[in-house]
UniProtKB/Swiss-Prot annotation:
Disulfide bonds: none annotated. Residues 54-61 are annotated as: Catalytic site for iron oxidation. Fe cation binds at E54, E57, E58, E61, E64. Signal peptide: none annotated. InterPro entries: Ferritin, Ferritin-like, Ferritin-like_diiron, Ferritin-like_SF, Ferritin_CS, Ferritin_DPS_dom. One of its GO terms (cellular component) is autolysosome. Keywords: Acetylation, Cytoplasm, Cytoplasmic vesicle, Iron, Iron storage, Lysosome, Metal-binding. Oligomer of 24 subunits. There are two types of subunits: L (light) chain and H (heavy) chain. The major chain can be light or heavy, depending on the species and tissue type. The functional molecule forms a roughly spherical shell with a diameter of 12 nm and contains a central cavity into which the insoluble mineral iron core is deposited. Interacts with NCOA4. GO terms for molecular function: ferric iron binding; ferrous iron binding; iron ion binding. Its main location: cytoplasm. This is Ferritin light chain.
Amino acid sequence: MSSQIRQNYSTDVEAAVNSLVNMYLQASYTYLSLGFYFDRDDVALEGVSHFFRELAEEKREGYERLLKMQNQRGGRALFQDIKKPAEDEWGKTPDAMKAAMALEKKLNQALLDLHALGSAHTDPHLCDFLETHFLDEEVKLIKKMGDHLTNLHRLGGPEAGLGEYLFERLTLKHD
């Protein structure tokens, strides 16, 4: 059944939004896995755990925002299977941060591709929506992760476990 409110919302854009929702669901699931890995008693890095669980929440808010926009534009949300994260054992903080940065770069590219598709279909509402709610935040997050990786590498060395602990305590402390 077609929507009575749909206007200037292409089926290509609708499909790309559904694909992006799936990517955000996958990212949230991955960050949840990361967060609870670092919360384990044999890993015990509370600040790192908190950082990744906050990202899981942000991605949840992102996919809900995308789904709401999809409905407001007269599109239909089509849910797909969510794969389990590639890892169960995430290793040390730098390894996890590298995996997270790769995930964010993939999300950012999908957002840029959707923006380009919206521009090609002359959909200013979609472009404004992405610029307002997603694109700037992605760039800031990638920068933050890059900074964290730089600091983790600085703290590495023969006592890498101590460096990881200090990074967690001094950089990722939370209230």
